[in-house]
Every structure is written in C-alpha cells, then in structure tokens.
C-alpha cells in the first residue's frame, strides 16, 4: 500500500484500521467509490479506472459534473483534471452551482468552446461570459455551430455588416458549409472577397466553391461570367498558381490569357504544363 493511500486510510477510516482489501464500503469511505459507476482509481497522469474500465480523467470529470457530483469532481480536480471539463459538463445538465464554483478557475472562458458539442450549451457558455451576440455568432462560425446561426437567422437578416464579417471569417477558417449557408440564406454585399481570400490562403477548394456558387447565380440571371473569370485568371496567372489557373479555365477562363501572362512573368511551371499538353495532343 502506497504512503499516500495509507494517509488517506488513516484520515478517513475509523480507528486507523488499514484494510487488507477494498470493498465498496471502504472505497466509499475513502471517497474512491463513484455512485452508480463503481470503484474509482487513478492509474496515470491522464487516466482513471472506473469499475476497472479505463477512461480519460477529463472525460470522467465531465461525466461527474454533468451528474452534479461535487465529491467526485473535487477528487478528479485534485488529480489534476482540466477544470474546463467540469464547467462544460455542469453546463450541459444546468448544474449552475457547480458551474459558478469552478468557473473562475478558467482564465479565458472561450477556451471551453472547443469542448462543447451541443449548440445550446455553446450558447449558455457565451451567456455566462456576458458575450455579445456578435461574439456568439463569430465563434459559432469558427466551431461549426450552424444551428446557432439558423436560430438567429431573422435577427441577422437585418444586420448586413455582421453577415459580411461572418462570411469572410468562414472563408478564412475554411468553413465551407458556413460559406454556402451565409451566402445563400443571409446574403452578402461583397461576395468576390471569397476569391481574394482563397488566393491569399492558396485554398483551391474555396476558390472552386466560389465559382460553383456565383456562376450558377449569373447563369440563372442571364449574365455572362467571362469578365469575372478572366479577371481572376489574370490574378492567378500573374502569381504563377497553376492549380488555380487550371480551375479557372475549367469554369470557362481563357487559356490564351494564362499562357500570355506565364510568358510575361516567366512562370515555367505553367508554360511546361501547356507545352506538355500541346505535345500530347499532337
């Protein structure tokens, strides 16, 4: 028996009796019995055994907090579990006494957000932090909480500045489903900023998504997209971005423009590609 366990036994068991084995009664006296779960044992820095089943200590903490079990939460925190999981677990089940007890252990409350799966809990976390709706919407984009934006769609419909900000953020963070939803449902004033962001970040998927969205709109309205395509073809050709050049040509951009600019700026990769294609066609 380790010295720390001996000390725990002397502190909690009657008559300083050190048991030879640990049944549920003894474990309960020691605070090592988790109601409805069984025995609780620390087996390493980041792991515990619950009724001999291994589980990450932070996951155990989240479960204990979601049950409102202060004793087990305190024990796991003393074993260096992450207090963020205690607050998140308590928030999920609305145990606000537990939430407020451990909330101040977290320096930046936004650090809890990656741990939250449920959109309602995500919103409660912002309410606790007295965040603005703009802050809530921004983090909803970053952490893929589309149901939050859907919930506030009518509110956002009258806030074009915020919609534009969220759209650009979704582009920068590569949240493609958010890009599609914000543009399609809320609308944005400056859609082509998507192409600028895609080129800066070398994000070919976003670049292609932009064309699939805007060309459908232009064709349905009877507009000719040639000017738009060749404008961005000039941009990506000047920069020597072959994958972007090919994608633009795929959507209808002029191959001649790409070759002309590749010659002007001596982009050998682009020139070799078209020379190889030409020789293969011959």
From Swiss-Prot:
Belongs to the asfivirus MGF 505 family. Induction: Expressed in the early phase of the viral replicative cycle. This is Protein MGF 505-3R. Plays a role in virus cell tropism, and may be required for efficient virus replication in macrophages. Coiled coil: none annotated. It comes from the Viruses. The keyword 4Fe-4S does not apply. Keywords: Early protein.
